[in-house]
Amino acid sequence: MKKTVLSLGLLLIPFSEPVAAGAAVPLIIPPPPQTQQPLPQLQPARVCPALEKALRVNLGGEAKVWSVTVLNSDGDVLGDVNGSVPRIPASNQKLISTAYALDRLGPDFRLKTRLLQNPDGSLELNGQGDPDLGIAGLQRFVLAALRQGGGPGESSNTVQLMVREEPRSNWWPSDWHPADRGYAYGAPITRLALTSNAVGGAVSDPYARLQRLFEREAQRRGGAVRIQRGQPPLSTSDAERMDPQIVLHEETSAPMHALLSLANTESHNFTAEVLMRQASGLWDVRAASRATERWMYEQGLPIQGLRVADGSGLSRNNRVTSRTIAALLMRMDQHPFSAYYQASMAIAGQRGTLRNLYRGSVLDGRFRGKTGTISGVRSISGYLQTADGPRYVSMISNGSVRPNTLMGQILRSVQRFSPCPSSVAPAKRRDALG
C-alpha cells in the first residue's frame, strides 16, 4: 500500500458534544458497526406549528425559491416548506453518491491501481480512479514494468504495456458546462488519474499525460516502454470473468471513510464521481446514475421527482427534493455504517466547507452537513444536534438573493424550537411522508 498524501482529518465525536474551537481534528476510525439495525420507518408526519411558522417568517418573500424540510428521529416532519418540489441540489448531490458508495462498498474499501501480467506474458495497467494517485506512484509502476524487460541489465526489448482507460466520451458527464471542464473542480473522470487530473486547472487529456510521463520516467531510468491504449471492462462483473492475471504492483487509495470525507468535507467532485461509478460497477455515468436511483428506491425513501445526472452535483440536470434528502439523512443515521457517514461531513465553525460559517454561534460544532454551490443554487443539509435529539435538516434554494443569511436563520430556528414548545406531541398534518 502506498503512503497517502491526503490530509482529511476525520473525527468521530459524540453528537451531544460540540467540537471545541481550535481543537485538533485527528483521524479516528469509528468503531465496528452494530449488526441487524432496523431500517427506519417514516411515520405519519407531525408538524411543529411554532417551527413551521418560524420557517415561513425566515423565508419571507423568498419562500417560492426554497425547499426546506426538518425531520426528527421518529420520522415526523416537524417543518416543511415546498419539501416536495424537486430542485437542483448542487453539491448536496454528494450526500446521495457517498451514501450509496458506503452502503455498497463498505468503510474499508480502497480504490486500486494495478500493473498486471496476463497469461501470455503481456502487461497491462488498470485503475479504479484513485484521486490520490501521484507521480511517486507512477514511478513505482515504471520500475515494476521495467523489471519485466526493457531496463538496464534486464533485456534489450522495449516493454509493451496496455493501458486500459475510458474513452473520451466518458470523461465528463455530457451536460457539464464546457467552461467548468477547464477548472480543477471540473476535471475529467478517468480510471487512471494522476493528481485527480488537475494541475492548477483541469488536465484536458489525462491519457496523453500519463503516457508521456510514464515513457519519460522509463527513459530516465535507462529503459523503454511502449504504451498502447485498451478499453476497460464494461462493468466490474466483466472484469471478474477475465483470465487470471498476476499482480506485479499495486497502489491503493485511502480507505472509504477517508474518501467520503474528501467528497463531503472538502466537496471534491472527482472523488464523488468515482465513488458513484465504483458503487454501481459501471463507468458510464448514465448507467451509474440509473443504478443510484434504483438504490434510493430500495431504501424506501420518498423519491418523487428524483433525477440523478452525476455523482458530484455539478450537473444542472440533477433534481431532488429537500424531503428526499432529509429522509436519506435519517436513513443513514440508522445504517450500520452511520458513524462513518456522519464523520465524513463538514462541521459548523470547525472543518471543511463549514469551517467559516456559524463560528462562535449556537450552531458552532453542533451542525454536521454538506454545502452546495453552483450559479444560482445554494444548498445545505445535515445533522443538527438539539436539546431534543438530532434533527435532519435539508435546505435547497434555486434563485435566492441572500441564501447564507437565510440558511443560518433557519438552522437557529430549528435549534430554538427543539423540542416543539406548542405541545409534546406535534399535531398531525395531512401531507404525510409515505
Model-flagged regions — what are they?
Residues 155, 198-340, 344:
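A small/polar active-site loop signature that marks catalytic segments
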Residues 113-220, 252-291:
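Active-site-adjacent helix/loop patches that line small-molecule binding or acyl-intermediate pockets
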Residues 22-86, 107-108, 144-155:
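Beta-lactamase-like hydrolase cores
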Residues 13-20:
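C-terminal segment of classical bacterial N-terminal signal peptides
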Residues 1-4:
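Positively charged n-region of N-terminal signal peptides that target proteins for export
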Residues 78-80, 276-434:
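Small-residue-rich helix-loop
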Residues 75, 89-107, 192, 213-214, ...:
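Active-site SXXK
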